[in-house]
């Protein structure tokens, strides 16, 4: 939580370490945040640079903000966890949802050091934040071999024309779960 008191902002989520002092188990910031959106983005960028230095994954960071407070941070962990879904945005979404006790990020914003890839964009839409802010573009990422253009193109192709073999199988059996979902009283709609 952050609380702005005159020229002092008190919080447990550091945004700008240079203005940070530790008192009684909380971080105290001295000075005003000039532009919170830029500070949140700088934190995502800092995470991306820290990730490069640590060698834990690609140069990507993300933070999720609610009510002016960073509630979750994520950095790319693909290579350090052997999880191809552990992109910075997905890591941050998982942490934020756990923090909030919700599968939706109502009234949240996500700040990404780079324009989200197709997978992350899908995850972000499912999480339903109110805004996405990004720094680097997908072209910037493509220039260092993180090129997702082929995925965007594949999504647009008819299933039978995709490069990854995709074939429907046992639809009639699978429809049973769809029908169950329609009538169950145990579902939480989303």
Annotate each predicted stretch with a short phrase.
Residues 28-53, 116, 123-190:
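Zinc-dependent deaminase
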Residues 82-127:
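Helix-adjacent hinge/juxtasegments
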């Amino acid at each position: 939580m952050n609380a702005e008191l005159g020229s002092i902002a008190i919080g447990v989520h550091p945004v700008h370490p240079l203005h940070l002092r530790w008192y009684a188990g909380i971080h105290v910031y001295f000075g005003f945040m000039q532009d919170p959106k830029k500070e949140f983005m700088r934190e995502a960028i800092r995470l991306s640079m820290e990730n490069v230095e640590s060698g834990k994954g690609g140069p990507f960071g993300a933070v999720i903000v609610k009510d002016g407070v960073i509630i979750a941070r994520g950095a790319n962990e693909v290579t350090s966890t052997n999880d191809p879904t552990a992109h910075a945005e997905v890591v941050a979404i998982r942490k934020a949802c756990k923090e909030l006790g919700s599968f939706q990020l109502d009234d949240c914003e996500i700040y990404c050091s780079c324009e989200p890839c197709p997978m992350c964009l899908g995850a972000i839409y499912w999480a339903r934040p109110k805004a996405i802010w990004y720094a680097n573009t997908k072209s910037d990422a493509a220039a260092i071999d993180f090129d997702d253009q082929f995925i965007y193109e594949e999504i647009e192709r008819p299933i039978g024309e995709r490069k990854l073999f995709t074939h429907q199988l046992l639809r009639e059996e699978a429809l049973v779960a769809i029908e169950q979902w329609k009538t169950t009283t145990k579902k939480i709609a989303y």
